[in-house]
């Protein structure tokens, strides 16, 4: 298990590619993110292609919506964001 004081490196999300794979009832997703210490044009990376079933995609959407609602409500601890 990781230590609580360990720093997690994060990268700002700047875009994505999403397409459907109708024959498998699935979606393919690639995230584009900014690499630190590089210019915007040089530093944009494209992550691996992810395969999401419709059930997993719905769960992902639900988790994102819950996170957005929590942030917008102001119902969070200040220390949650200082670690990043």
From Swiss-Prot:
It holds the Pfam family BssS. GO terms for biological process: regulation of single-species biofilm formation; single-species submerged biofilm formation. Induction: After 3 hrs of cold shock. Disruption phenotype: Cells show increased biofilm formation when glucose is present in the medium. In a continuous-flow system with M9C medium supplemented with glucose, the biofilm had a 240-fold greater biomass, a 2800 fold-greater average thickness and a 16-fold increased surface coverage than the wild-type. Represses biofilm formation in M9C glu and LB glu media but not in M9C and LB media. Seems to act as a global regulator of several genes involved in catabolite repression and stress response and regulation of the uptake and export of signaling pathways. Could be involved the regulation of indole as well as uptake and export of AI-2 through a cAMP-dependent pathway. This is Biofilm regulator BssS.
């Amino acid at each position: 298990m990781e230590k609580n004081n360990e720093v997690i490196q994060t990268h700002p999300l700047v875009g994505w590619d999403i397409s459907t794979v109708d024959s498998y009832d699935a979606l393919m997703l690639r995230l584009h993110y900014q690499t630190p210490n590089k210019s915007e044009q040089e530093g944009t990376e494209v992550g691996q292609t992810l395969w999401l079933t419709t059930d997993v995609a719905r769960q992902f959407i639900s988790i994102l919506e819950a996170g957005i609602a929590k942030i917008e409500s102001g119902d969070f601890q200040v220390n949650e964001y200082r670690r990043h």
